[in-house]
Amino acid sequence: MGDVNRIKSVAQRVKETYAAGNQVIVVVSARSGVTNELIGRAKSLNPDPDDREMDLLLTVGEQETIALTAMALHAIGVPAVSRTGKEAGILTDLAHTRARITSISGGDIKDQLDAGKVVILAGFQGYSPDGQITTLGRGGSDLSAIAISAALNADICQIYTDVDGVYTADPRVVEHASKLSEIAYEEMLELASSGSKVMQNRAVEFAQKFDVVFEVRSSFNNNPGTIVKEEAASMEDVVVSGVALDKNQAKVVVSDLPDHPGTAAELFNALADAGISVDMIVQNIGREGKANMTFTVPRDAINRAEKTVVELFPDEAQGKLFEASDIAKVSVVGVGMRTHTGVAAKLFAALAQAGVNIQLVSTSEIKIAVGIDPKDAEQATRIVHDAFDLGVESS
């Protein structure tokens, strides 16, 4: 959502859908910039604000939007009612600021729809078993929309964004990136997890689990978007579907760890317990019974990662235990990689020819990701995009 004019525009589009005889649930996020403004205010008072209080604060943005959207619909003759995440029965675990949905009752949403009303639902939020407000993390409104669609068995789920679909790369980085008409859940999940900002990765994961077919489309026009669905046999004809760039990563080197069985498990269990997502892991055997571990984490998790590592290995913390530096991750994704060979060779050759040094590599069945110097990130994305001939209209 943007300003008041954007809310009016959304209301008009909802009216058209409602007038066509559909029951409509509209899941909304905070107005553009509001969440960042609230975070800024909080951190001006306390650089490390309490997670529970942050959840209470940040849900203000969505609650403002649901009320304004309902008012805008009333003004053009559409019966509408707003509902918070708690009123919709979106139950989560206790993890404030990054809660996971455990169940959805739907509250009275079905009754309101049957009564002929449009329901405006606050995205991004739910409530914990002890009744406290929780939030679902950045992009959580996508997850709310997918989850309520699954719970109520909706016929169609449309995700409206500031882009008109899923592209072979970020069009702001690769000018000739092309829009995909469809993409498999797995590919979308890998792209979302690799830096693509179109959708929250947990939302895609939820859609795949409950087989919610959805369309990513633009808020600003009526053009068809990208359908995200279960993999079709024809999708394997395309080896690579897209290239993702994530510049919000840090490379962490943990040095002089005890080189014995269980150390790695101990380290990564502790990081997981701290809610830190880890990727691209490399272990180097050191000397004299010591080993070094290198991995990547989101840049905003560096302080938490360091605190976790130092607390876990206090004896080693007297030396050069923890070092962090910026890194960029470029990933190629495609379900066709399962049945085609040579993808890694082509990727590495393209980067080598351009003089881009690879620091780290990670792979899955349908993804290859490389960690590189951030200064090379955008150039590398364009090079890889061209190497796999993605600059043509994809189907």
What does each of the following model-derived ranges do?
Residues 1-204, 284, 296, 372-373, ...:
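Nucleotide/pyrophosphate-binding catalytic subdomain
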Residues 12, 36, 71, 193, ...:
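A broad, structural surface signal
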Residues 22, 78, 212, 276, ...:
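Short phosphate-binding/catalytic loops that engage adenosine nucleotides
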Residues 45, 224-395:
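A conserved regulatory-domain signal marking ACT and ACT-like small-molecule sensing domains
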Residues 173-178, 183-193, 198, 202-250, ...:
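Acidic, glycine-rich loop-and-beta core segments that form the ion-binding/anion-interacting portion
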